[in-house]
Amino acid sequence: MPETFAYYEKIEKEHDNVKVVYWEAGFNYSTINNFGFKFAKGDYIMLLNNDVELITPDIFQSMLGLCMRPEVGIVGAKLLYNDHTVQHAGVLVGAGGLADHVFKGIHEDDPGYMGRAISSQDVSAVTAACLLVKRSVYEEVGGLEDEFQVAFNDVDFCLKVRKAGYLIVYDADVKLFHYESKSRGMEDTTERFIRFGNEMMLLNSKWDILSTFVDPYYNPNLSYLEYYKINHTIKEARKKQLIARGEYSAPKK
C-alpha cells in the first residue's frame, strides 16, 4: 500500500531511533518477519501488522509487563473489527478445523464465557497481527517457519514456544482494530485456497491436531464447533457407558 510506505519514510525521517528495512522478494509472512528480526536490537520484539490501529494508548507497557515474567514467552492482544466486535481474543487449537479465534463477533465489552473474553490469561496461541515475544525465545525456537507463507505461522510459532516450556498470554487489556488482509486481500482465489489447504495439512502433520492434540486451556466437555457450549455428543457417549455398566441414574424431574 503506497500510504504505508509513505508513513514508513515519514517516521524514519522524524525519529533517529527508527530504521526501516525493505523486503524485495515475494510475500511470505514468516520469512519477512524473520528478515526484520535480524535488524531489530531490542530484548523484546513486537510483530505488528500494518492493518491494525491502536486503541489502547499504553499497549507496550501493558504487554511488556506480562512478557517480562520469566515463564512467559509471548503476549498477544485483543483485536476488534471496526464495529467494536471481537476479531481475536486468543486462539483455540483444535477448533475451526485446526485452530480458530475464540469469541469472534461478540461486543468488545461482552465478558464471554466465565469472563474469559475480558480476562488476561494463558492460551495455546495468539495471532501474530500483534504479538510481543522475548528476543531470546524467538532465537531459541528459530523464529517463524518459512514453509507457513501466510496461514498458521503464528499458531505454529506459539506451539513451538509452548513446547520449549514458555507460556503464551492473551492480554485482554490491550485493544486494537484489525482491518484484516489489507495488504494482500482475502483468500478468495483458487491459488490461495490451495495454498491455505496445504498449510492446514502441514500444521496438522507437524502437531497431529486432529488426532491427539488437546488444548490444555479448553474444557474437553465443551464443543469445538460451538465454542464454550456443552458437547452433547460426549455427554451422550458418557451416558451410554454408564448404562452399559449399570451405573446410570436418570436425572430427577
Regions found by a protein language model. Name each.
Residues M1-G26:
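Acidic donor-binding segment of Leloir-type glycosyltransferases
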Residues W23-A40:
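Glycine-rich, basic loop-to-helix element that forms the pyrophosphate-binding segment
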Residues L48-D51, E145:
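Active-site acidic Asp-centered loop
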Residues V52-G96:
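Conserved donor NDP-sugar-binding/catalytic core segment of glycosyltransferases
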Residues I59-M63, A117-G142, E147-F177:
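A short, conserved alpha-helix in the catalytic core of glycosyltransferases
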Residues V75-K78, D171-A172, Y179:
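Short glycine/serine/threonine-enriched helix-capping/active-site loop
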